[in-house]
């Protein structure tokens, strides 16, 4: 087989492989909220890979061997009372908009200078 036909054959095979691969799901911004508690009676199916796969405000949640789009919960606890006479020290900037933007169990709460920060909740 001539070299030009062999090159064309290899190029065609590579193109066929690339077209046969599934599209890569975007890693869109994470949606607000916290996934609800795991329900016991679920089949092992994958409805989503990331929040971008879910409609509206639904969040892609892992529940055992399942990933499903669910309405998220807020994080537990409530925001601590802010003493206006003694506002928090530090930068007076918005650090978050919703609880899910805060690490761990921290909540997004008013910080005393008209902005919001990730703070330890009151239980």
From Swiss-Prot:
Signal peptide location: 1-26
Domain WAP, by residue range, is: 28-69, 72-122
GO BP, one annotated term: antibacterial humoral response
* Keyword terms of this UniProt record: Aspartic protease inhibitor, Disulfide bond, Protease inhibitor, Repeat, Secreted, Serine protease inhibitor, Signal, Thiol protease inhibitor
Q: Where in the cell is it found?
A: Secreted
Q: Name one Pfam family in it.
A: WAP
- List the GO terms this entry assigns under cellular component, sorted alphabetically: extracellular space
Source taxon at top rank: Eukaryota
GO MF annotation list: aspartic-type endopeptidase inhibitor activity; cysteine-type endopeptidase inhibitor activity; serine-type endopeptidase inhibitor activity
Q: Using the chain's own numbering, where are the disulfide bonds? A: 35-61, 44-65, 48-60, 54-69, 79-109, 92-113, 96-108, 102-118
Q: Which Gene3D superfamilies match?
A: Elafin-like (4.10.75.10)
Asked whether the keyword Disulfide bond is assigned, the reply is: yes
Tissues of expression:
Detected in the distal parts of the epididymis.
Tell me the SUPFAM superfamilies matching this sequence: Elafin-like (SSF57256)
UniProt keyword annotation of Kinase present: no
Assembly notes:
Homotrimer; disulfide-linked.
PANTHER family the UniProt entry points to: WAP FOUR-DISULFIDE CORE DOMAIN PROTEIN 2, WHEY ACDIC PROTEIN WAP
Q: What does this protein do?
A: Broad range protease inhibitor.
In Swiss-Prot or TrEMBL terms, this protein is called WAP four-disulfide core domain protein 2
Q: Which organism is it from?
A: Sus scrofa (Pig)
């Amino acid at each position: 087989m001539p070299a030009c036909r062999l090159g064309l054959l290899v190029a065609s095979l590579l193109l066929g492989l690339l077209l046969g691969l599934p599209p890569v799901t975007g890693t869109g911004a994470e949606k607000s909220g916290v996934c609800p508690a795991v329900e016991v009676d679920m089949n092992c199916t994958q409805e989503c890979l990331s929040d971008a796969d879910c409609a509206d405000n639904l969040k892609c949640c892992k529940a055992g061997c399942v990933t499903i789009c669910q309405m998220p919960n807020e994080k537990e606890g409530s925001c601590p009372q802010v003493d206006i006479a003694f506002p928090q020290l530090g930068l007076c900037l918005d650090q978050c908009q919703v609880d899910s933007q805060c690490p761990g169990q921290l909540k997004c709460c008013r910080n005393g200078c008209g902005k919001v920060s990730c703070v330890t909740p009151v239980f």
